[in-house]
């Protein structure tokens, strides 16, 4: 997952850095941690690892939304993930996840992904009704919470259980 990918140049650089040849320029050896450091034919190995690697580029600014079609058209990109909190902040509408500008941004990214056979993703929206609305529109890579929110939910359950024992 790569944050703040605003343009084609940055997107291409991320593909180059994250993918093995022929898609990128990541260094290759015959034994990698992805295959338990066993020796493999590197020609086949690079293809297998490239196909098993998910490259997610975050769309978090109006510029990135404007460039979504071009970014989605880059070979080696799998998901365009809208970072909704950051996008709202950049647009000057903090927390307004159902604002027309955000809905339009979602539609733009979804259309770009559908056109190029990529997956549209969303993060930062955890209201079930809004999530359902955006999933219905075409979001397919869904962040349904954050590490911190999941840990805090578990901690609250544990704290309540302990308080019940006291």
Protein language model features and the residues they cover:
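Hydrophobic faces of well-ordered beta-strands that scaffold small-molecule active sites
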Residues: 1-2, 55-60, 80-82, 120-123, ...
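Conserved anion-binding
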Residues: 2-75, 86-89
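Alpha-helix N-cap and loop-to-helix initiation/capping positions
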Residues: 6, 97-104
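C-terminal helical cap(s) of enzyme catalytic domains, especially alpha/beta-barrels
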Residues: 8-24, 148-166
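Glycine-enriched alpha-helix->loop->beta-strand junction motifs that scaffold or abut catalytic
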Residues: 19-20, 74-79, 136-142
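Short beta-strand/loop segments at the ligand-binding rim of alpha/beta enzyme cores
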Residues: 47-60, 108-122
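Glycine-rich, proline-tolerant flexible connector loops at the mouths of alpha/beta enzymes
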Residues: 82-100
């Amino acid at each position: 997952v790569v944050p703040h990918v605003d343009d084609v140049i940055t997107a291409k650089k991320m593909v180059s850095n994250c993918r093995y040849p022929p898609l990128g320029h990541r260094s290759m050896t015959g034994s990698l941690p992805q295959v338990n450091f066993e020796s493999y034919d590197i020609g086949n190995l690079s293809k297998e690892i490239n196909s098993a690697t998910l490259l997610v580029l975050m769309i978090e600014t109006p510029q990135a939304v404007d460039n979504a079609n071009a970014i989605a058209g880059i070979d080696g990109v799998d998901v365009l993930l809208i970072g909704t909190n950051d996008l709202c902040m950049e647009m000057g509408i903090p927390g307004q996840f159902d604002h027309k500008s955000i809905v339009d941004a979602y539609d733009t990214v979804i259309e770009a992904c559908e056109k190029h056979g990529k997956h549209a993703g969303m993060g930062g929206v955890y209201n079930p009704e809004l999530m359902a609305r955006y999933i219905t529109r075409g979001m397919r890579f869904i962040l349904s919470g954050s590490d911190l929110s999941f840990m805090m939910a578990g901690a609250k359950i544990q704290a309540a259980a302990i308080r019940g024992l006291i």
